Design a protein with these regions (language model features):
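Conserved Helicase C-terminal RecA-like lobe
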Residues: 139-281, 343-361
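Walker B catalytic acidic pair
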Residues: 34-35
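Conserved helix/coil segment N-terminal to the catalytic DExD/H
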Residues: 2-30
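Short, well-ordered alpha-helix to beta-strand connector turns
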Residues: 6-7, 28, 54-58, 77, ...
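Conserved RecA-like P-loop NTPase helicase motor core
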Residues: 13, 39, 236, 246-335
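Structural recognition of the conserved hydrophobic beta-strand(s) that form the central parallel beta-sheet
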Residues: 11-12, 59-65, 265-267
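Conserved P-loop NTPase motor "coupling/switch" region that bridges the ATPase
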Residues: 30, 47-134, 309-312
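Substrate-gripping "pore-loop 1 plus following alpha2 helix"
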Residues: 38-51, 294
Length: 361
């Protein structure tokens, strides 16, 4: 109905882009894409649909705080200039600027930039791209990052090392296993948090070290509202059980948080993305479990650290020493959170364990 009305500006969410392109007569002469990174997949329907109708628009503007890696730029820039700078085909772009990295004979799993590719790509797109940091142009509060380290006891660490080495943790009524490096990454991060799903999706308790650290941080907040970022459902269940935390899912709960009426709230990074304004409710964010996604990490942090925040933002990361937590944190800090970074981290851990066990033998 809204499209039938005459207006200067129309607003639509990205989930309806395909519908808009296929069902509506295209008569827009300008397109503004908020969060251009959501069009970084050249295989996605929304990218293909918008690319098909892009020539009908005179001007296109794309906004994003997380453009991704060099490979992602092909689709994002292609939406803007219709392939003028980086080429019309992903294959040609890949051949020109990248080399195969991880492969199994003819199967290529990842690519790495050629020498000088990064500078060359940036030079090609520099005339249509501008980078601005919010803190350089807006009144932004200070943001401080902290690490809080925990360590498992000998019995708990033994279980972790067994899973790391064998990719299997046997129980009488259901094993915890991983079929590949990516799956093992998920299992190890779960165990670092304190619990893990077995093959029957039953939760296996490992330790409470992170819950204890979270309790200390909540007490140190001295009554100020705390927002806890979790990744796995069993993390949320344990946080809710111990601290009576309120998940920020319903509109009513979000409203109460913004009014300062929720002492401990929990949020999943995937639901804390673009456009959620909750900075009025607090200034303390605690990462109970980490993610490999730099975009989700940055967007979640930006829910509190943004214009309108009146306090210094405190972001804590609870890190389990000697676990994959350290690798995930390092990847986030180095802004290297691709699939290859995950696999490299797991392989390095496995290699270290297997090497140590061979020496013991």
């Amino acid at each position: 109905d809204a499209l039938e009305k005459k207006a200067s500006v129309y607003v639509i969410n990205r989930e309806n882009v395909v519908w808009l392109c296929e069902k509506h007569h295209w008569d827009f002469d300008m397109i503004v894409i908020d969060e251009l990174s959501s069009f970084k997949s050249y295989q996605a329907k929304r990218f293909k649909a918008l690319r098909r109708y892009r020539p009908k628009a005179i001007r296109v503007v794309g906004l994003t705080g997380t453009p991704g890696n060099l490979m992602d730029l092909w689709a994002e820039i292609g939406i803007l200039d219709m392939g003028q700078r980086l080429g019309r085909y992903i294959g040609a772009y890949r051949d020109r600027f990248f080399l195969p990295d991880k492969r199994n004979r003819n199967i290529i799993y990842s690519y790495k930039p050629r020498d000088g590719a990064e500078e060359a790509i940036y030079n090609l797109i520099s005339d249509i791209c501008i980078s601005m940091k919010a803190e350089d142009y807006l009144s932004m509060p200070e943001c401080l990052y902290h690490r809080v380290e925990v360590r498992m006891d000998e019995k708990e660490e033994k279980l972790y090392r067994q899973m790391e080495k064998d990719m299997l943790l046997p129980f009488e009524d259901g094993d915890v296993d991983a079929v590949n490096a990516a799956a093992l990454s998920g299992k190890l991060l779960q165990m670092a948090n304190g619990a893990v799903y077995d093959e029957n999706h039953k939760v296996r308790h490992i330790h409470d070290k992170k819950l204890d650290a979270l309790e200390d941080l909540i007490e140190a907040a001295n009554g100020k509202p705390v927002l806890v970022a979790y990744w796995y459902q069993h993390d949320l269940d344990r946080i809710v059980e111990r601290f009576k935390a309120v998940p920020l899912k319903a509109a009513g709960d979000i409203r109460k948080w913004k009014e300062g009426k929720i002492p401990v709230a929990a949020i999943h990074p995937a639901s804390a993305g673009h456009g959620l304004n909750i900075q009025d409710g607090g200034h303390i964010l605690i990462w109970f479990g980490l993610t490999w996604s730099l975009e989700l990490y940055m967007q979640c942090n930006a829910r509190l650290w943004r214009q309108g925040q009146r306090e210094t933002v405190m972001i804590y990361h609870i890190i389990n020493k000697g676990t994959l937590d350290e690798d995930a944190m390092r990847s986030l800090e180095q802004k290297d959170c691709g699939q290859s970074a995950i696999i490299d981290a797991v392989k390095a851990r496995i290699g270290g364990v297997n090497g140590a066990s061979r020496k013991d033998d």
